[in-house]
Amino acid sequence: MEPIPFINHSWSYQGIDGAASSEELRQARVVLQNELQELLSASLSPIEWYQTVNELHDRIYRKAVELCIQGMVEEGFGQPPVPYAFIVFGSSGREEATLWSDQDNGMIISDNPHEGKEEYFAQLGGRMADMLEELGYAKCEGKVMCSEPLWRKTLESWKEQLRSWRSDLAWEPVRNLIIASDMRFVAGEKGLADEWIAAFYDGFRAVPELSDAVLRNTVKHKATLNILGQVVTERFGEHAGGFDVKYGLYIPLVNSARFLALQHGIKETSTLKRIQRLVSLEAVPLTLLDAAGRAFMIALKFRRSTPVVIRGGLQQSSGFLDEKQMKQKQMHYELRDTLGQVRRVHRALQRQLRFAERRRP
């Protein structure tokens, strides 16, 4: 696979950097989003497009943190009493968020003693979730947000939480560990995030059974090709005749690359970077990684091709290719071929799981 280029386009983020309120920040997001989607999409590769979109999100997150703290200072709460880190998970953690992605975030708070720090950061976390919602980032249905105590903790409490999840290999704790594995630092004190990452990977290596537990989670996803090799579309509802790009194509590849990365101690969060590191380590057959990498590039393209609607000046998408798109021969052929590559990767992981299950006492 070709190395991922670093793109630094020259348009101005002045509207974000100079925003003095959530209203101004939302308007800056609308302006830059429209410029990105309408003027630049045709000239940017999928990788360039996602890099630029995620740089936009990161700048908005950092400004939102600044505005929330400014509001707390003005209301008498003061500056943060101890260092903290604002972190993201999900597609933002993997730097694969679309223009319409929702919230997936958390917070790490320093262990430095201060009597009022829990109350302060509970207030800040709640304000952040509310402001991001005002800015067009829907609140996470799974409540993975810094407003929730489960995802807003002191560093030591985070370490205890990670230990707790590692000690219980049931579906929910393993799912939370999988979510946590995509963590990426955005704002605040980076050293807290670095220490969190070290604790996560040290702990993961210390529990060999975790790898199989993650694999069991990884191989579960919706069927996308029938026994004749035809694409399985939605049969009923508003998306009838359409195809679920997120859960039918994108997420299975994300999950596969994540599992292989965790198995081999790779700390990258970007799916493509995980695949590239696996290639460099020669940890997995090259033909399998090549299939996964090519399929993932198509998945990125299809994710940004799903129909969008404009609400309040901001784009929203269901994540489905619609029936009209599915009737386009070239798109349908490309999707079917890519899903064949996904099935190939999936079957390889299923074989690995069967082998692991046979080894269990």
Predicted regions and their residues:
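Hydrophobic packing residues in well-ordered alpha-helices of helical domains and bundles
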Residues: 25, 29, 50, 54, ...
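Alpha-helix N-cap/helix-initiation motif
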Residues: 46, 50, 114-121, 245
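Conserved NTP/Mg2+-binding pocket subregion across the NTase superfamily
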Residues: 123-248, 252
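N-terminal regions immediately upstream of nucleotidyltransferase
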Residues: 1-72
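Conserved nucleotidyltransferase catalytic core and NTase-mimicking acidic/glycine-rich helix/loop elements
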Residues: 202-361
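Active-site nucleotide-donor binding segment shared across nucleotidyl transfer reactions
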Residues: 57, 61-117, 122-124, 129
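Core structural elements
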Residues: 26-29, 83, 90-93, 217-229
